[in-house]
Amino acid sequence: DLPLTDHCPGYPSLAKFLANAVRDATYDSLATPRLHPVKFIEVMGRDAGWVAAACALGFSDSERDLLPLIFMPEQPPANAEAALAEISDRVNRDGFCVCVIPETLRDSPGRHFGGDEPLSIDAFGHPYFPSAAAAMTRLVQEKLKLRARYERPGTAARMSVSLASSVDQEEAYGLGWAAAARAATGASDIMVTLDRVSDAPYQCAIGTAPLSQIANRVRPFPNGFATTDGRGITDSFRAYALPLLGEQPFPDYARVDFSRIV
């Protein structure tokens, strides 16, 4: 979510990991919806929906009916009751709900679902709050009387080398080389960046930007990348993000058409 760059190194691999994990979690719920009708997946991202949005990338056109319910930080639910109503509607419609939430899920007034007392504060002044997914799981069990569970991939999502994007690996090497070359010439107070040249075929060029315009700033998830209700992604985001994941990032899954079984 850094400004002045198309994306950050590491994001493509994180996106690939989470897109696969959420798709797998959805097929698990599809197979056994009564085991846990509600499943929360808590992901990194305090104020911007880049990571949460990536969780919906693994679903093909024929799987659009399986898309997860995503609560973007930029478009939070009005309150806990509103969030529960959306989850309940999805369960009534599909028999289950896979819900992606940011680690610091808040309601419209800014109250943290996990509690407003931070557990810790990092060197940059970023507070770390109790798990939003744990709090939402309790609410679903208490208010909706449904079985629920939550998953927290945590840092595993950004350090799984076995699922790294080939595009990410190539770009990270190029960025490191470019940064070292500029440092060798005495350049300072800059960050090497990725500048999008084209989507199809995908191409990014390496550039630079002043560090003073990047540090401690956040690039919000664009309105055009999220659906109007803030609970899903648009084809514009798919066109932006899918090329970052490399070739064939998702396995093919078969689905049984139960309507044709006699």
Each model region followed by its residue ranges:
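Glycine-rich, charge-decorated loop segments at or immediately adjacent to ligand/cofactor-binding or catalytic sites
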Residues: 1-7, 160
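Short, ordered loop/turn segments at secondary-structure junctions
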Residues: 1-2, 74-76, 103-105, 153-156, ...
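Sparse, context-dependent recognition of short Cys/His-centered cofactor- or disulfide-binding micro-motifs
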Residues: 3, 24-26, 83-85, 177, ...
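Surface-exposed loop/turn and secondary-structure junction residues enriched for glycine/proline
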Residues: 5-7, 47, 54, 73-75, ...
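Accessory alpha-helical/coil subdomains and C-terminal extensions
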Residues: 8-149
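C-terminal non-catalytic interaction/assembly regions of soluble proteins
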Residues: 112-262
